[in-house]
C-alpha cells in the first residue's frame, strides 16, 4: 500500500477512489480557478457546500476550510442516465477543496472507482473519459 502522505508531498496522490493534488492557492482562489478550468472541459458547478460553515452552524467545532463542489457535464449526465438510470445515484461528480495541517488540497472522486461495481464496459470506458477531463481541470487549477 502506498503512503498517501508521501504521495501528496510529491504533488499528487492517486488512491482507488480519489485523485488529490496540493495547491499553494487560497481555498477561495482554488475554487475560482477550479470553476474556470472545469468550464474549459465542459463542466459546470451545480452547487457548493461549505462544510466549515455548515458544521459551525450546527454547533460543531470545525476550523479547517472544506468546500465540496458538485460538478456536472450535462451531455455526459444525459448519456449515463439514459444508459442506466441507477447510475444517477453516483451523480453529480464531486471535487473537494480543503485545508489540512495548514496546507490546501484539491481532490476529486474518481468516476472509474465509482463505476467499477456497475460491471458495464461502456460505462467504465465513459468513466475513464470523464475522469481524464476532471484530472486535466484539477491539474490546471492547482
Predicted feature residues:
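Terminal, regulation- and interaction-focused segments at domain boundaries
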Residues: 2-42
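Compact, glycine-rich, soluble single-domain proteins
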Residues: 44-97
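Well-ordered alpha/beta subsegment
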Residues: 117-142
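Beta-strand/loop substructures that line and gate deep hydrophobic ligand-binding cavities in soluble
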Residues: 94-120
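Short glycine-/small-residue-rich flexible loop motifs, especially phosphate/cofactor-binding loops
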Residues: 35, 52, 135
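Short secondary-structure transition/capping segments
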Residues: 89-102, 138-142
